[in-house]
Amino acid sequence: MAAQRKKRLSRTEKNNALLAQAAAVKVPSVADVVVVGGGASGLTAAISAAEALQDAKHPGTVVVFERALECGRTILATGGGRCNFANEDVRPENYRHPAFVRSVVGGKYLKEVLSFFRTCGLAWITEDEGRMYPVTREASSVRDVLLTRAKKAGVILACAREIVDIQTTSQ
């Protein structure tokens, strides 16, 4: 018996499936850490927060709110769809405001970025001008390792939700 081909979903069917998946996520009304935006920076921030809570043996809730139907969609467009996730030649003097870049990036930027992605299980190559890409040359590889690590860390991914207001409480 010939193997059946898997039916490819239309864009509408895929979006409906993602919307149903997003609606099924239970979002707490109170969280220890809320990250608005589920792109690369938001996912990385949420992972770092969730793992810090775990390391401190402090049970906590980390939630990422993403307006789109799925987290990490913006990653897919970076680097021409290949995701240039780092550059081995990041020097503050290459930027318009080197002092600002130095204060944000610091001296350990590349080492920390590569350590983070190595821990995620991402393998990469370095191409011309120091651009670093996943060995698959597919941006989805970067998105997938970030989503996997976020879920492993217990991050709640609340997609298809737009934030209008956040209230803070002191503890």
Regions inferred by a protein language model and the residue ranges of each:
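Glycine-rich FAD pyrophosphate-binding loop
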Residues: 34, 50-80
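Short beta-strand to alpha-helix junction loop
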Residues: 101-109, 129-148, 158
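Beta1/beta-strand and adjacent pyrophosphate-binding region of the FAD-binding site
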Residues: 25-41, 63
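Small-residue (primarily alanine) positions within well-ordered alpha-helices
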Residues: 41, 45-50
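General beta-strand structural signal in soluble alpha/beta enzymes
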Residues: 66, 126, 157-159
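A short, basic/flexible loop-to-alpha-helix module at the beginning of a structural domain
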Residues: 2-3, 11-30
